[in-house]
């Protein structure tokens, strides 16, 4: 995320260098910055050089719960797992509750949920709670937020 450049002196120096390159090489220099909208706005406003030189902005909408659920199923399939209907519903409910949170990371969050759920599934399988070795069910779906 480009806005992480604001957090230290080296990053601020990099920002100054980028702005100089944008001015000195404007006909042959393309700068692409990416990150969350609010933090990017803070980055752009941190230096008048950005405000006067950046002319194009692209905004991407977050994925819908349905799209994230499909992504979850596809990621699980890639590692040899299927998703029971109950697990699919549990995942959708979980994502719905997390989706508007500040640190929700779309595909990154989906991957983290899958990894935690797979770990829980292994324990549930060992304990005999679930019977199918390669099918996640609703008891497997879990997510623990990182507390800062």
Model feature map: region roles:
Residues 2-12, 57-59:
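Flexible beta-alpha connector loops of hexameric P-loop NTPases
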Residues 1-2, 33-39, 63:
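A short beta-strand-to-loop transition that corresponds to the Sensor-1 phosphate-sensing loop
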Residues 25-29, 50-56, 79:
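Short glycine-/polar-rich loops that comprise or flank the Walker A/P-loop
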């Amino acid at each position: 995320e480009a806005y992480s450049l604001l957090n230290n002196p080296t990053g601020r120096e990099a920002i100054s260098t980028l702005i100089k390159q944008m001015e000195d090489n404007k006909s042959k220099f393309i700068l692409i910055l990416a990150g969350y909208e609010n933090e990017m706005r803070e980055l752009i406003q941190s230096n008048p050089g950005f405000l006067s030189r950046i002319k194009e902005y692209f905004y991407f909408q977050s994925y819908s719960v349905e799209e994230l659920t499909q992504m979850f199923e596809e990621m699980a399939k890639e590692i040899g797992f299927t998703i029971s209907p109950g697990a699919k519903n549990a995942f959708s409910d979980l994502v719905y509750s997390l989706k508007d949170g500040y640190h929700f990371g779309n595909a990154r969050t989906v991957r983290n949920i899958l990894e935690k759920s797979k770990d829980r599934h292994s324990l549930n399988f060992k304990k005999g709670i679930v019977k199918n070795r390669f099918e996640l069910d609703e008891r497997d779906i879990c997510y623990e937020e990182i507390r800062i």
